[in-house]
Design a protein with these regions (language model features):
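Short beta-strands and strand-coil junctions in structured, solvent-facing domains, enriched
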Residues: 1, 33-34
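Conserved hydrophobic/aromatic "anchor" residues
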Residues: 1-2, 42, 144, 148
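ABC-family ATPase nucleotide-binding domain "signature/switch" substructure
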Residues: 4-11, 20, 25-31, 41-140
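A generic structural-conservation signal
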Residues: 35, 77, 146-147
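C-terminal boundary and immediately downstream tail of ABC-type ATPase nucleotide-binding domains
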Residues: 139-171
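Long, low-complexity, intrinsically disordered segments
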Residues: 170-178
Length: 178
């Protein structure tokens, strides 16, 4: 985030956005209630890189800005890497509808970010070593399956991995309500 108000940070996504559009984007990004709690609301000045906001709040303001921008291609680089579990859930809930209908490239160590990707690429030491859907990669029993086991079944959701970076690309398609 830039050293300016939350409003101006959001308007970088769409300079001519109306107050109603700002509200809709903030609600979609799960940050509206927090902004409303601030003494100056959208006119609250945030410091360089958003020092007055938590990591999750900064991410959600950035997501609201992207919602306003409405890009055809979305690139997420470690979107939930430094967040606690609660903030991660809020950010992921905001990302799901944002990713629908557009190409999304997500770079992540936390596999929860990419489970529903159409295609997952696993990189190790600078090379793509696996490619497939979540189910396919689990069946193969390679690096991805080991990371999944470590992060989910082993209860180490915040595990730091040394095997490589996981990248996912594709559109997220909602298959039910929720």
């Amino acid at each position: 985030l830039f050293h300016t108000t939350i409003r101006r940070n959001l308007l970088y996504g769409k300079p001519d956005a109306t107050d109603e559009e700002l509200d809709a984007a903030a609600r979609a990004a799960n940050i509206y209630d927090r902004i409303a709690e601030l003494p100056d609301g959208y006119d609250t000045v945030v410091g360089e890189r958003g020092y007055k906001l938590s990591g999750g709040e900064k991410q959600r303001v950035a997501i609201a800005r992207v919602i306003l921008k409405d890009p055809r291609i979305l690139i997420l680089d470690e979107a939930t890497s430094s967040l606690d579990t609660t903030s991660e859930r809020l950010v992921q809930a905001a990302l799901v509808p944002l990713m629908e209908g557009r190409t999304t490239i997500a770079i992540a160590h936390r596999l929860s970010t990419i489970l529903s990707a159409d295609v997952i690429f696993v990189a190790d030491r600078g090379r793509i070593v696996e490619r497939g859907t979540h189910a396919e990669l689990l069946r193969r029993g390679g690096i991805y399956a080991r990371l999944y086991e470590q992060q989910f079944r082993g209860g180490l959701v915040e595990a730091v991995t040394e095997d490589g970076v996981i990248m996912a690309t594709g559109e997220v398609v909602r298959t039910g309500s929720g």
